[in-house]
From Swiss-Prot:
Domain of life according to the entry: Bacteria
Protein name in the entry: ATP-dependent RNA helicase RhlB
Renumbered residue ranges of the record's region Disordered: 395-435
Family the entry assigns: Belongs to the DEAD box helicase family. RhlB subfamily.
Compartment list: Cytoplasm
Source organism per UniProt: Shewanella loihica (strain ATCC BAA-1088 / PV-4)
GO MF annotation, one: ATP binding
InterPro entries cross-referenced by the UniProt entry: DEAD/DEAH_box_helicase_dom, DEAD_box_RNA_helicase, Helicase_ATP-bd, Helicase_C-like, P-loop_NTPase, RNA-helicase_DEAD-box_CS, RNA_helicase_ATP-dep_RhlB, RNA_helicase_DEAD_Q_motif
């Protein structure tokens, strides 16, 4: 569970079920983040909330604690059947659902409550077998949940707690009809605890909340501060000819411990992966076309430090909770201002420092004014010395074939294959020319 800066509010001060308190202590959670400190007092009084909070603010722990506590302190509905979960958590992406389920297991192992997860891209029958054994808390994407509802595998008439996470992205991805379909199959709003979280509480998100929740209380966390003060931002204006060389040079100079490179299209991400892989980096690729099992494996490798760089589109990376990301590179400036905030919010978490490097190239530079207006500050410009860029870049690898590690041919060194080297290549940090 990712954390941000903490408050003086302790979890121990809340009237939580003893098993929840034990789970929090053993998991190392003592102090609340702002969203937890504001939302839990409301939720523990069995009141609904609509919370505005970015990824990385601790909202996942907030709604999981509230959900588990509600189920442990509320009688099980009379006549509840094995195929009737008591709580449901809806997420816009498979990766987010998987992360929520992993976090939920930290609480589940202390409480005896069973967590089940369902999402597309994995075996329908394998997931069904888990559901057939009965789950208390169902976590998943709306499409797969609807499949099981229509087949009678699960029944939502015993739901006592509902979480809708990243509601704004649900709208972006066109899932709102699915959400309304599921809400109509649950008990009335006043018979359950309802929680909605969103990066923005737009009018359409608020309308959804008031349609399907019981007079929710609005909770907002620092709405005026879109980006963390822990993140150092800078922007370059590269030519299209220099763009790839600049990225490879900066990565070699910065030598990030764990970095995510964002691009706007699948094709561009594949091209980036091919060049980074060809340059000897340990890099993974996340786009919508990557099979689910491979996506999970790549994320595990990145989390464990077996990969140093992850190349991703916004949709593929939405909802990821990965700790210790030191650098974010925006190879393309996003078309959506909120995506810029989501991207750079992958770094600078838990009080750590982070670095965000953006490229305003000829194709996407027009997106910059809107982004700076949205984040309410200008991004410092860094010039670069084009003559200092790498000029001996190996050719990109082919994305559709397996390849053996090859030695780097760069005279200045290069990343050895097979593991993170102890020192970066011997190249002077002379590309940046600060104004």
């Amino acid at each position: 569970m990712s954390e941000t800066h903490l408050t003086n509010q302790k979890f121990a001060d809340f009237s939580l079920h003893p098993e929840i308190q034990q789970a929090l202590v053993e998991s190392g959670f003592e102090y609340c983040t702002p969203i937890q400190a504001l939302s839990l007092p409301i939720l523990l009084e069995h009141k609904d909330i609509a919370g505005q909070a970015q990824t990385g603010t601790g909202k996942t722990l907030a709604f999981l604690v509230a959900t588990f506590n509600h189920l442990l302190t509320t009688p099980i509905p009379d006549g509840r059947q094995l195929n009737q979960p008591r709580a449901i958590v809806m997420a816009p992406t498979r990766e987010l659902a998987i992360q929520i389920a992993k976090d939920g297991e930290l609480l589940a192992k202390h409480t005896g409550l069973k967590v089940g997860i369902v999402y597309g891209g994995e075996s329908y029958e394998v997931q069904r077998k888990v559901l057939d054994k009965g789950v208390d808390i169902l976590i998943g994407t709306t499409g797969r949940i609807i499949d099981y509802v229509r087949q009678g595998v699960i029944n939502l008439s015993a739901i006592q707690a509902v979480v809708l996470d990243e509601a704004d992205r649900m709208f972006d991805l066109g899932f709102i009809k699915d959400i309304r379909f599921l809400f109509r199959r649950m008990p009335d709003a006043n018979e359950r605890l309802n929680m909605l979280f969103s990066a923005t509480l737009s009018m359409k998100v608020q309308e959804l909340a008031y349609d399907h929740m019981n007079d929710p209380e609005k909770v907002e966390i620092a709405p005026s501060e879109k980006t963390s003060k822990n993140i150092t931002e800078e922007i370059f204006y590269p030519s299209m000819e220099d763009k790839m060389r600049l990225l490879l040079t900066l990565i070699e100079e910065d030598w990030p411990e764990k970095a995510i490179v964002f691009s706007n299209t699948k094709h561009s991400c594949e091209n980036l992966w091919a060049h980074l892989e060809g340059d000897g980096h340990r890099v993974g690729l996340l786009t919508g076309d990557v099979p689910q099992k491979k996506r999970i494996r790549i994320l595990e490798q990145f989390t464990k430090g077996e990969l140093d760089i992850l190349v991703a589109t916004d949709v593929a990376a939405r909802g990821l909770h990965i700790s210790d990301v030191s650098h974010v590179y925006n190879y393309d400036l996003p078309d959506d201002c909120e995506d810029y905030v989501h991207r750079i919010g992958r770094t600078g978490r838990a009080g750590q420092k982070g670095v965000s490097v953006s490229f305003a190239c000829e194709e996407y530079a027009l997106n910059l004014p809107a982004i700076e207006h949205y984040i309410q500050h200008s991004i410092p410009v860094t010039n670069y010395d084009s003559e200092a860029l790498l000029d001996d870049i190996p050719p990109p690898v082919r994305i559709h074939r397996k390849h053996s590690p090859r030695p780097t041919g760069r005279s200045g060194g290069g990343k050895p294959q097979g593991g993170r080297p102890g020192a970066r290549p011997r190249r002077h940090d002379r590309t940046r020319r600060h104004s």
